[in-house]
Amino acid sequence: MGVLLREALRSMCVNNQWSYAVFWKIGCQNSSLLIWEECYNETESSSNPRRLCGLGVDTQGNEKVQLLTNRMMLNNRIILVGEGLVGRAAFTGHHQWILANSFNRDVHPPEVINEMLLQFSAGIQTVAVFPVVPHGVVQLGSSLPIMENLGFVNDVKGLILQLGCVPGALLSENYRTYEPAADFIGVPVSRIIPSQGHKILQSSAFVAETSKQHFNSTGSSDHQMVEESPCNLVDEHEGGWQSTTGFLTAGEVAVPSNPDAWLNQNFSCMSNVDAAEQQQIPCEDISSKRSLGSDDLFDMLGLDDKNKGCDNSWGVSQMRTEVLTRELSDFRIIQEMDPEFGSSGYELSGTDHLLDAVVSGACSSTKQISDETSESCKTTLTKVSNSSVTTPSHSSPQGSQLFEKKHGQPLGPSSVYGSQISSWVEQAHSLKREGSPRMVNKNETAKPANNRKRLKPGENPRPRPKDRQMIQDRVKELREIIPNGAKCSIDALLERTIKHMLFLQNVSKHSDKLKQTGESKIMKEDGGGATWAFEVGSKSMVCPIVVEDINPPRIFQVEMLCEQRGFFLEIADWIRSLGLTILKGVIETRVDKIWARFTVEASRDVTRMEIFMQLVNILEQTMKCGGNSKTILDGIKATMPLPVTGGCSM
């Protein structure tokens, strides 16, 4: 397919005074790379001495252009997007048009300046770079100053975009695969791609007329001979012919692989034309004589030769046989690499029925076909059907599936035959993965034995998991250790466990301080020492609240009389509400009275009088209100303690 790209570059140079044309292709694997794909320079078009003399081509300038393109290819065969003139154009998406007489070095980076100096030293006066997303970049150079033409820029981009619709058209000849080049030998790019009316396409030896004819995306056409732009000179034929206005000649662009057979087959009506005496033959005469026979296989399958773009010239049967031969050889290589591919359990039953239908239709058809053409078609399809290509019968029940349309464009002969093997291979692999019968284990198909033992009432058929059993055992142990945790829920049990652990942590923390606590001084002295009257005029002269200092600092001993109310736990809550930590709490009986004694620790510097006044306030409100202790505590917390710096003798 590289002939199409090369023909497009040649058309740009020859008809628009460009000295060279280069197509940089965006890398398929890495889009940040631009790869030198194809190049054309005017040295190739001026190899004929007669043409050099007639056109006045400067051979020395052509040699400089040739050396320039060779140096460009050797130095920068692969460039990064964003580097250099071509890379910057691909990155920005804007074309660049640089003239030697107006080149400004201040607006370009050093790498671009070096490139332009190299171009100018080779005699190039104009350099143009056109990015064509997503295919690549076109670079043009001319030894003449050419003014910027936006119409030409758009036409070049449109030409490359249309070439991109042809599979493999933007690949050079070095990267061609099994696609036969004979399908496009002698066919200029204007026959493959619709004309845009610009000079770039009108310059081809074969110019496609802007008519209702549609060309397919695979690059094959029906090769209808069309008119060319006016030309008064008839040059010598180099494997082709030149034409005058309204009459046909074959182009000088590309020479078929077998020129003699091609000319005898398609232009036998011109065998008597003398080279010195050119005859003008209308297009319709030649197109009526050039065909040796129609392709009845395509006719029977509903594809018209003229409308679908199938080619009948150049020995269609032979070329298609070569295509299928290459496809089948590729398939055999795949089959050798994957032995399971040919034995996946599917046969070509659908294709065999298709072949029978085609052959029977050919016998009953009203068209007369040559034995040679039908035999070649039958042999070709027989080779395909007898191969071990795996496809289900429902995948191709009718022949119309062989000629599906892509994007609304009919498929040409190369894609019809060339891509069918690939589609069969893909279908077979997908069906092998999805639709092939799954190997079922015998143990899966066997019915489970009905030998379960009947369980007794209350038995659990499945044992409890080991981790769950261990959790249940630990919860049971916690219920035995934590006070009042026998009948609470698991979350309440965990909460009690946390509180119990904090309590034990405080006990271990203050264990040394508990050893230093002493007894009450009131009980040691006769008469009880100084006391505080709870109520004036009461019979009891014993103070119900006593607060003493105990070494070390911030350790106090609080004693409260709780005989009448029995508020031991409430007293403990009151003490905690004052921000004190209870280190020890006991209930003692003294002279027929019950006392609650607490050893507490303060977290800040407080006096015993401050603690005493708070406890008196709490006790007074309790006796007066006789209400809930929690409500009383909430009210006490709202009152700030009075700072007392002096001591109180007990």
UniProtKB/Swiss-Prot annotation:
GO terms for molecular function: DNA binding; DNA-binding transcription factor activity; protein homodimerization activity. Its main location: nucleus. Expressed in both root and shoot meristems. Present in root tips. GO terms for biological process: maintenance of root meristem identity; positive regulation of DNA-templated transcription; regulation of DNA-templated transcription; root development; stele development; xylem development. Pfam families: bHLH-MYC_N, bHLH_LHW. GO terms for cellular component: nucleus. Keywords: Activator, Developmental protein, DNA-binding, Nucleus, Transcription, Transcription regulation. It comes from the Eukaryota. The keyword Cytoplasm does not apply. InterPro entries: bHLH_dom, LHW-like, MYC/MYB_N. Residues 456-470 have a biased composition (Basic and acidic residues). This is Transcription factor LHW. Residues 381-417, 431-470 are annotated as: Disordered. Homodimer. Can also interact with bHLH proteins. A motif (Nuclear localization signal) lies at residues 451-458. Transcription activator that regulates root development; promotes the production of stele cells in roots. Coordinately controls the number of all vascular cell types by regulating the size of the pool of cells from which they arise. Residues 384-397 have a biased composition (Low complexity). CDD domains: bHLH_AtLHW_like (cd18915). Belongs to the bHLH protein family. LHW subfamily. PROSITE patterns: BHLH.
